[in-house]
Amino acid sequence: MRRFRSTLAALAVAGFATLAASAAFADTTLLNVSYDPTRELYKAVNEAFAKEWKAKTGDTVKIEQSHGGSGKQARAVIDGLQADVVTLALQGDIDQIAKAGRINPDWQHRLANNSSPYTSTIVFLVRKGNPKAIKDWDDLTKDGVEVITPNPKTSGGARWNYLAAWAFADQKFGHDEEKDKDFIKKLYANVPVLDTGARGSTTTFAQRGIGDVLLAWENEAFLALDELGADKFDIVVPSLSIKAEPPVAVIDEVVDAKGTRKVAEAYLNFLYTPEAQKLIAHNYYRPSDPKSADLKDLARFADVKLVSIDDPLFGGWAKAQPKHFADGGIFDQIYQPKSTN
């Protein structure tokens, strides 16, 4: 089996796992707690960083990985998971870790681009030939269309999905929040199951054959074409989407206790180097420094109108998180779980 198919199969057994790896021969071991669909990216980055660190310092470093829905991962770190670094799906999740006292409040200003070494967006993955003729967000609200997306309570990607749909509705209905809510309610009425993370939703759609369209991270959609077959799926780019900015941070409490700050900071800084930026683009993420990427990797990214979380429509994560995703927020108001009877 190819690597992506193997990852999907493994996810069915364990939705949250650390890569099994002995640190017996490592001078330093770091734990990178990341969001769901970054496995392939960080496998490549970790190998490159370990090689560079060895050449620079003579020391051996081992980076272990943990993956799951971004919100779930943030909660694990808040509850005591000893992560040296987090590479999560959105600022709001790292802010929650900072509020718990495990990260210094200034974390987002330590690295370039608000500590986001790459960006992504949300696209649609449909079955080959696009049998339901899905072209844009309003097609997702039609009768007879099944939409696969994760749970925004646990998944960062799911929150980006929701906000992209909200931005489309707001543009369509002229900033009428009640109509925006109704649009989102209709969309989620077409969702048969909410997985906890993005990779789980990919499994549901691609492996289990459920649904007509998957709301996917752009990188996850390209990876599905590459690993599961371009003869099985098509990518549809909507007229408008969201500028997803996944940030990274050192867990100050952990690195100071373990004495791993120097290597942990070097690891995150490495993400901004030309070598890592090239790997980022090759793994289907949009690099913060496009000049470092291969042109053939950049060519796959569609030119699409992207709305920022800092747009007045959302007002940043400090406003968007409680308004839309907190207990009793808009998502709770509009979503009715499917009956299991």
Where in the sequence are the language-model features?
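Periplasmic-binding protein-like
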Residues: 116-120, 182-188, 195-196, 228-261, ...
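Cleavable N-terminal signal peptides
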Residues: 13-14, 24, 36
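N-terminal segment of the mature folded domain
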Residues: 27-155, 295-298, 335
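Short helix-loop capping/hinge motifs at secondary-structure junctions, enriched
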Residues: 129-135, 154, 167-175, 254-262
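Short beta-strand->loop
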Residues: 33-35, 126-128, 146-173, 188-191, ...
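Ligand-binding pocket segment of bilobal, Venus flytrap-like solute-binding proteins
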Residues: 172-239
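Extracellular/periplasmic juxtamembrane helices and adjacent flexible linkers that interface
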Residues: 255-341
